[in-house]
Amino acid sequence: MILTSLNLYQYRLPLDVLLPVGKQRIDHRAGLVLQACASTNVGGEYRQVEVEIAPLSGIDVDEQVLVGFSRETLAQVQTALTELLLLLGGQHIDTLLDYAEQSSYPSLAFGLSLLHAKLMGKLDAIRPQTATVPLIYHPTDAGNDLLDNKVAALGMHVHSVKVKVAQTSIEDELSLIYGILRTRPDLKLRLDANRGFTQEQAIEFAACLPLDTIEYIEEPCQNPQDNLEFYQAIGMPYALDESLNDPNYQFAMQNGLTALVIKPMLLGSIEKLANLIETAQSYGVRCIISSSLESSLGISDLTHLAAILTPDEIPGLDTLSAFSQDLVVSSGKKHCLTLAQLEPIAQHAIDSTQQSDLGAAKREEN
């Protein structure tokens, strides 16, 4: 199939509540939507798809730069994509994979490879998981009653929840966790520390928890080299998340390592993700697809991708409740923005004569 048109849009979605990004908070999410049309030839098979490309970078509510997540900025990706559109028009869709492998921006590499997968129809017949792992954290403006009500409202089909820790005081967070377990003692907890504890703090915190209720704790220590000593001291399994963002990261099995929390927007192409997952699973390490706070468009694609790459795991994608509206794909919110309501950034299309020439050239090759 040949790429016949590409359109790039920018979005900015306000959030109804602040979302945690490590220890920081954001009140909106910004990103890009890339739409592509491809056809076999004039009058032949035709497909039109959209993908979200949204590095997790920018400014928090305190006007501080977000740290520890995407290395590239939205402006850098936008510039690269604007230039790339001129090169992609009229090319075979496999060219998307070539540019994905060449890109030094993980969010762009992932977006291009996802665009290729959707144009190829690889996500079409997939039935994604309906189960969720709800995210629980302590919003700055929420009281204990609100959190208790949220936990009490969870359906009995929910068996695990993700809890943000290393955000406030150890005492407050222990109170939060025991409050969750008091309301739903059957729940298993996935704790996410975002490297917020020193080794000593992590050990002190974990020692106060009932180990049999904890599936794992993500990135317990500020220095990931301390994770092994943390595990040896406490026996609580841990998962890696931010560690995967290191461009030099190579999987290495360690005692206590039980899971990789994989954020595709931060890591790169689908091929890179698949290779990492295959390696980790060969050592018995679980792989959990997780969001980078994408909009409904990105979350929809991640649910389908998780069903392909990690069919036996429930992905960690429960972040849409904070969004004020949906984007392109509805998740059930009252408002869903269409492409016509977004800011157009760039576009490129080949005309019918060029399409005919490309079709004729393809027939000659065959």
Question: Over which residues does each language-model region extend?
Answer:
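N-terminal capping/lid subdomain adjacent to the active-site entrance of alpha/beta enzymes
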Residues: 1-189, 196, 207, 328-366
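Active-site lining segments that contact anionic ligands and/or coordinate catalytic metals
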Residues: 31, 257, 312
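Active-site donor-binding loop signature of nucleotide-sugar glycosyltransferases
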Residues: 53, 219, 317
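Active-site pocket-lining/capping segments in soluble small-molecule metabolic enzymes
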Residues: 105, 122-124, 223-225, 290-352
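Catalytic core of soluble alpha/beta enzymes
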Residues: 168-292, 296-300, 304-306, 323-332
